[in-house]
UniProtKB/Swiss-Prot annotation:
Changing residue 45 to A: No change in inhibitory potency on alpha-7/CHRNA7, 4.6-fold decrease or small increase in inhibitory potency on alpha-3-beta-2/CHRNA3-CHRNB2 (depending on experiments), 2-fold decrease or no change in inhibitory potency on alpha-4-beta-2/CHRNA4-CHRNB2 nAChR (depending on experiments). Residues 45-48 are annotated as: N-terminal tail important for activity on alpha-3-beta-2/CHRNA3-CHRNB2 and alpha-4-beta-2/CHRNA4-CHRNB2 nAChR. It comes from the Eukaryota. Pfam families: Toxin_8 (PF07365). This is Alpha-conotoxin GID. The record marks 54, 57 as: Important for determining subtype selectivity.
Length: 66
């Protein structure tokens, strides 16, 4: 292979690695956002239940202090 061909192959490999890295970072960001939203929803439901006496009596495992 000539020098130009080797340089072209090198650039293609770098480009492919960059694209794979970028898309995997974006996917992990999406999972983190989903986990944070799930945690926030759970905390909101727990807080609303624990502030309601009837719900607190029926669900003591939810309102247990940690």
């Amino acid at each position: 292979m000539g020098m130009r061909m080797m340089f072209t192959v090198f650039l293609l490999v770098v480009l492919a690695a960059t694209i794979v890295s970028f898309t995997s970072d974006r996917a992990s960001d999406g999972r983190n956002v989903a986990a944070k939203a799930f945690h926030r929803i759970g905390r909101t439901i727990r807080d609303e239940c624990c502030s309601n006496p009837a719900c607190r009596v029926n669900n003591p495992h939810v309102c247990r202090r940690r």
